[in-house]
From Swiss-Prot:
InterPro entries: 4_helix_cytokine-like_core (IPR009079), Interferon_alpha/beta/delta (IPR000471). It comes from Ovis aries (Sheep). Constitutively and exclusively expressed in the mononuclear cells of the extraembryonic trophectoderm. This is Interferon tau-5. Disulfide bonds join C24-C122, C52-C162. It holds the Pfam family Interferon. It is found in: Secreted.
Length: 195
């Protein structure tokens, strides 16, 4: 687990180099919040993931959306926003409160909310008139289905400690993917199709 965390943190740190600006400092503040949220998720570890191997599940993380050219420029920002919103929704529940250290959980929810608030300040600059179309964007539907699968899994498992541990590890993967997407947005100044 320590090796995996080190690898994830290294990937996140690599993405912190100087990048473009969307006029709202997306690359700086958002990336710092993302790094802190990953650290908090790591600190929330209460069980060894090895003790929960029987509960493992492939949630079908839609990584292909941030790899290669599958995600269009006008879809990247809403996908990032949706991933963070769904992450917040997952941890801001009564079931989550019962499973985790309250202080760490509150810090994580605050960090996710800060990322969302920051994205809200950038949304108009990046999206313009596209906001009304967000519900119909296929990648957004894919993200929603992914998180619905996580909610369904937790319910199936009775919100057990092992189920939450599996979800915690999965959320580290998801937030790492969202960090990769943030990196692409900032590196290209919001234009995913630029060289």
């Amino acid at each position: 687990m320590a090796f995996v965390l080190s690898l994830l943190m290294a990937l996140v740190l690599v993405s912190y180099g100087p990048g473009g600006s969307l006029g709202c400092y997306l690359s700086q503040r958002l990336m710092l919040d993302a790094k802190e949220n990953l650290k908090l998720l790591d600190r929330m570890n209460r069980l060894s993931p090895h003790s929960c191997l029987q509960d493992r599940k492939d949630f079908g993380l839609p990584q292909e959306m941030v790899e290669g050219d599958q995600l269009q420029k006008d879809q990247a920002f809403p996908v990032l926003y949706e991933m963070l919103q769904q992450s917040f929704n997952l941890f801001y529940t009564e079931h989550s409160s019962a499973a985790w250290d309250t202080t760490l959980l509150e810090q994580l929810c605050t960090g996710l909310q800060q990322q969302l608030d920051h994205l809200d300040t950038c949304r108009d600059q990046v999206m313009g008139e596209k906001d009304s179309e967000l519900g119909n964007v296929d990648p957004i539907v894919t993200v929603k289905k992914y998180f619905q699968g996580i909610h369904d899994y937790l319910q199936e498992k009775g919100y057990s400690d092992c189920a939450w541990e599996i979800v915690r590890v999965e959320m580290m993967r998801a937030l790492t993917v969202s960090t990769t997407l943030q990196k692409r947005l900032t590196k290209m100044g919001g234009d995913l199709n630029s060289p």
